[in-house]
């Protein structure tokens, strides 16, 4: 399940940057990519929930990682909706960067992730 989750969030991040670039260029395909992105949000949340459920003794860090992961998805939506409305998205980008760094750090630090830290 770990590999499914990693694949899911990796595709989610790639689709997010594709959606951002399509949104900036004003392409008509941006809506289709955003719908695929939302589908991968669901895959990421489900696989993350299944991973969380499979842990025998849940540390508070796993709960924090899940919350930060949901925050990251929210920041992605804030960036995309702000761009669509033509608003300033600097705060949303800062939130996205902070959440992304935190979720990567927690994901690689905890025992279910890869041993980078």
UniProtKB/Swiss-Prot annotation:
Specify the protein name.
Answer: UPF0344 protein GWCH70_0687
Which compartments is it annotated to reside in? Answer: Cell membrane
Name the family.
Belongs to the UPF0344 family.
Q: Which GO terms describe its cellular component?
A: plasma membrane
- The intrachain disulfides are none
Looking at the UniProt entry, the stretches that span the membrane are 2-22, 32-52, 55-75, 97-117
| Principal location listed in the UniProt entry | membrane
- Mind listing the UniProt keywords for this protein, alphabetically? Cell membrane, Membrane, Transmembrane, Transmembrane helix
Coiled-coil spans are: none
Q: How does it sit in the membrane?
A: Multi-pass membrane protein
Which organism was this protein described from?
A: Geobacillus sp. (strain WCH70)
């Amino acid at each position: 399940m770990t590999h499914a989750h990693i694949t899911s969030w990796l595709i989610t991040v790639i689709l997010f940057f594709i959606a951002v670039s399509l949104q900036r260029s004003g392409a008509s395909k941006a809506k289709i990519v955003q719908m695929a992105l939302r589908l991968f949000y669901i895959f990421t949340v489900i696989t993350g929930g299944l991973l969380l459920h499979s842990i025998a003794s849940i540390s508070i860090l796993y709960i924090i990682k899940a919350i930060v992961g949901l925050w990251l998805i929210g920041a992605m939506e804030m960036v995309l909706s702000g761009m669509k409305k033509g608003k300033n998205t600097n705060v949303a980008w800062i939130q996205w960067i902070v959440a992304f760094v935190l979720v990567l750090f927690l994901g690689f630090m905890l025992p279910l992730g890869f041993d980078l830290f």
